[in-house]
Amino acid sequence: MRHGDISSSKDCVGVAVVNYKMPRLHTRAEVLDNARKIADMIVGMKQGLPGMDLVIFPEYSTHGIMYDAKEMYDTASTIPGDETEIFADACRRAKTWGVFSLTGEQHEDHPNKAPYNTLILMNDKGEIVQKYRKIMPWCPVEGWYPGDCTYVSEGPKGLKISLIICDDGNYPEIWRDCTMRGAELVVRCQGYMYPSKDQQVIVSKAMAWMNNTYVAVANATGFDGVYSYFGHSAIIGFDGRTLGECGEEDYGIQYAELSVSQIRDFRKNAQSQNHLFKLLHRGYTGKINSGEGDQGVAECPYEFYRTWITSPDAAKEQVEAITRKTVGTAECPIEGIPNEETPSGHR
């Protein structure tokens, strides 16, 4: 894994992340104009970064945040659709892969159900290789319909890629799911705002280390009239060290080369910090010394996870016992979110 050049190689995937300024849009026409702006940026970036194999844009970079519910439903996209065709043309022209945000994607029961918050991974032929729907919408603010699974897809030069979105990344389970299924690069597209800059920078580095994976973060910048976004798009090595990181500048770009062979060699040959292998071979040294074979222990030792899988309702009761039973709290009420002093109901 390398940083500082504009090249790539047969072994190294050139990855760029963009500090895209959060747009404030209201109509479908404005969304499509912004998609064309993103497309033009891709073509220009490839001229400056000839090694670029993959370009990544933040959550909300295509639509912005529609704070008006009617606008959110009216501008929700289909996949494939007009926006994806604009991106497909750009990927073909620039001969690069791309990750793009669609907020939202129409629900199958549109407009009776809330849209999804969706990312797509597109190849250099303009084909959609992965479509991921955000599993953990940023409640209580985000009103997206939740997705229900992660994916792993083969990306440029065979690098295996998973997509996650913003608040997803605050839950260690999603990182483990992606990497245990084979992901070598976890792409975290986010529209993260202050105050949690320090926490979000730390968590992506920590998850890279804990899961022996490359991480690419693309975040928004600017002020959209409601939130201020902190940028700091970054590319992180599988050892948890940052290869390149933007500041807070609008349209800042970072670029690094991710070796396919290095991460595979590490996962095969690393020992004391091979967190993926060791999780399913717990205590193998002690087992060897005890005459109990050389495989360690594979059984899950964590009671909460066993309960969650076998009895989700019991796990929910367990967490409510140490937190609260209602989705909202009366001490800081939010309109449309039921709390212990208000009746249930949807927005």
Swiss-Prot record:
Protein name as annotated: Aliphatic amidase
Catalytic activity: a monocarboxylic acid amide + H2O = a monocarboxylate + NH4(+)
Gene: amiE
Stretches assigned to the CN hydrolase domain: 13-260
Top-level taxonomy: Bacteria, Pseudomonadati, Pseudomonadota, Gammaproteobacteria, Chromatiales
This enzyme's EC code(s): 3.5.1.4
Keyword ATP-binding included in the entry's annotation: no
InterPro entries: Aliph_Amidase/BUP (IPR050345), Aliphatic_amidase (IPR023719), C-N_Hydrolase (IPR003010), C-N_Hydrolase_sf (IPR036526)
GO molecular function: amidase activity
Domain of life assignment: Bacteria
Membership in a protein family: Belongs to the carbon-nitrogen hydrolase superfamily. Aliphatic amidase family.
PANTHER family attached to this UniProt entry: ALIPHATIC AMIDASE, NITRILASE C965.09-RELATED
Keywords per UniProt: Hydrolase
Record-annotated active site: 59, 134, 166
